[in-house]
Amino acid sequence: MATTTPNAAPSSCKVVLAGTVAKGLLAEVSEGREILEKPPHLVGFLANNDPAAKMYADWTEKTCKDNGFRYTLREVHRDDIEDALLAANVDDDIDGIIVYYPIFNNRQDQYLQQIVDISKDVEGLSHRYIFNMYQNIRFLDPAPGPERQKSILPCTPLAVIKILEYLQIYNTILPYGNRLFGRTICVVNRSEVVGRPLAALLANDGARVYSVDVTGVQQFTRGEGLKRRHHEVVEMEGWKLEDALPHCDVVISGVPGDSFKIDNKLLRQGAVCINFSSQKNFTPEVKEKASIYVPAIGKVTIVVLLRNLLRLNQNRRLDNVHPAEAVEKPGTLESVRNS
């Protein structure tokens, strides 16, 4: 006679897939696209042999075509990438430019980020956009007014923000700009493209952020009681990842390579865990500790790319239409704040 074993208790962890979050954002993007006279044209430049970059390019192409956007992938030798970007800057048929990094894996990549025309920079990597982001400036225009042009935020950090909004980590009772007040967040990655900008965005919205890389831990905050308009950075002398993790409600990790794993024992019970690396930074046991686990963010990043493309289109006033709803939803990070 077979023995009957009691049913195992259901997992207390909710796994949220990027595709689920992306669906709602895609609906907004479609609204914005439909009011334009012609589909915006995004051009991607691939100058490396990175399989992850090619996969991202393929996802971008599919998402564009499925949602009424034009997309062209241009594969060029890295020695020709500078001239290709300069030509794209003055091509009136191109509305947005994305470059799949890394190419040179050094300061040359940073230089390339700066030569993309600001009016076509869907990735938000131009100096003006980066300066505005760190200084918590949301507009390109200095004076208030109905025609103010909004600054572009980097795609991957903004994708994480959109996921946090979907997960209701942002407290909508609080005013815009303070909605992460009371949250303590760990960002494991301090790259200039993703990790540091993400820490700055989270801190500018009120969170206490521990930014971690191989050199140690930095704390990003707006000070006690959010007295500062934008974040400040303090070195946490002697701290390592294991010192920061137990304090954090949210853990966001994006370390490249298969060897790095977050120690599940260091996570707070009920933490929200988000992985933005191409590899899995969390072990399968994360579901035993986390309340919410997001294993990847790629599909959200691509939708954010299209939202940025719509915003560039709006900023350039090509079609003289009312700003697309896709980039104007109230209660989000990008909403108008008159303060």
Predicted regions, residues:
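Short beta-strand elements in bilobed, periplasmic/extracellular small-molecule ligand-binding domains
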Residues: 61-76, 209-213
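Short glycine-/small-residue-rich Rossmann-like dinucleotide-binding loops
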Residues: 102, 254-257, 277-278
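Phosphate/diphosphate ligand-binding glycine-rich loop within oxidoreductases
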Residues: 70-156, 285-286
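Eukaryotic N-terminal low-complexity, Ser/Thr- and Lys/Arg-rich leader segments
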Residues: 1-15, 318-339
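Positively charged, low-complexity intrinsically disordered leader regions
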Residues: 2-38
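Rossmann-fold NAD(P)-binding glycine/threonine-rich loop
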Residues: 110-143, 269-328
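A short, aliphatic-rich alpha-helical micro-motif
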Residues: 91, 244-246, 266-268
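Glycine-rich phosphate/diphosphate-binding loop of Rossmann-like nucleotide-binding domains
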Residues: 47-59, 141-262, 272, 288
